[in-house]
Regions:
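Acidic, divalent-metal-coordinating active-site segment for phosphoryl/phosphodiester hydrolysis
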Residues: 177-189
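Structural preference for solvent-exposed beta-strand-turn elements
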Residues: 104-106, 168
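Glycine-rich beta-strand-to-loop/alpha-helix junction loops that act as flexible
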Residues: 172-177, 195-199
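Conserved N-terminal beta1-alpha1 strand-loop-helix module at the mouth
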Residues: 1-88, 94-96, 103, 110-111, ...
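Short beta->alpha connector loops at strand-helix junctions that form conserved
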Residues: 90-92, 116, 137-140, 197-198
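Short, electropositive alpha-helical surface patch
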Residues: 84-92, 187-195
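Non-catalytic terminal and connector segments of soluble metabolic enzymes
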Residues: 15-19, 163-167, 172-173, 186
Length: 220
């Protein structure tokens, strides 16, 4: 499966956000990852539809939106209107997951489902064929710059095995504590979409993105 880098703008410098986004695109990052937090599902508060809509007007990158909010079905239409291409919701935050997935698909967006580190991967079994992407959190969601949880590798492997057994080539995205030094491990475990915040935006953005792209070429 094609390996894709999704720089997380939560780690960007918002004073020069447009410039930094262009740097990621110029070096080959096809996605942009947006962590939307409501201060309830997770402790932090980040940004919402206006930021997404503003960025949408300046890039052709895939808008990959991760909703870390309670009862996310309330926001599906608003994020679609703001320009989201992929809308990922948390299994733990949805009262009726099927209804949420149906609403996302009806809007024309791709639907992702995310799980926290403490949620059993097996809990995704009923919706393996319903989602377009699964996002495995490799840190506790809500804050950037945390250390990668090593047990995440087995969780990625288990999910890829579950998908393979059903003949599904569904994307597995991973987020949290991923750097050039450990990205091969998550790819080897079965992930193909890599969210990176600090690893992209700290230091030379061009050099960092190029580093990920060079590793991805090893898997072509």
């Amino acid at each position: 499966m094609k390996k894709i880098l999704a720089p997380s703008i939560l780690s960007a410098d918002f004073k020069v956000l447009g410039e930094q986004i262009r740097m990621t695109a110029d070096k080959g990052a096809k996605y942009l990852h947006f962590d939307v937090m409501d201060g309830m599902f997770v402790p932090s508060i980040s940004f919402g539809m206006p930021v997404l809509k503003s960025i949408r007007g300046g890039t052709s990158q895939v808008m990959d939106v991760h909703l870390m909010v309670m009862d996310p079905i309330r926001y599906v239409d608003a994020f679609h209107e703001a320009g989201a291409d992929i809308l990922t919701v948390h299994l733990e935050a949805c009262q009726d997951m099927q209804a949420v997935l149906d609403k996302i698909h009806a809007s024309g967006m791709k639907a992702g489902v995310s799980v926290k580190p403490g949620t059993a991967i097996e809990s995704l079994s009923p919706i393996l064929e319903q989602a377009d992407m699964f996002l495995i959190m490799c840190v506790e969601p809500g804050f950037g710059g945390q250390a990668f949880i090593p047990e995440s590798l087995d969780r990625i492997k288990n999910l890829r095995t579950m998908l393979d057994e059903k003949g599904l080539k569904t994307d597995i995205e991973v987020d949290g504590g991923i750097y050039l030094t450990n990205v091969r491990e998550v790819i080897d475990a079965g992930a193909n979409i890599i969210v990176a915040g600090s690893a992209v935006f700290n230091g030379s953005i061009s050099k960092n993105v190029t580093g990920f792209m060079e590793i991805f070429k090893e898997y072509e």
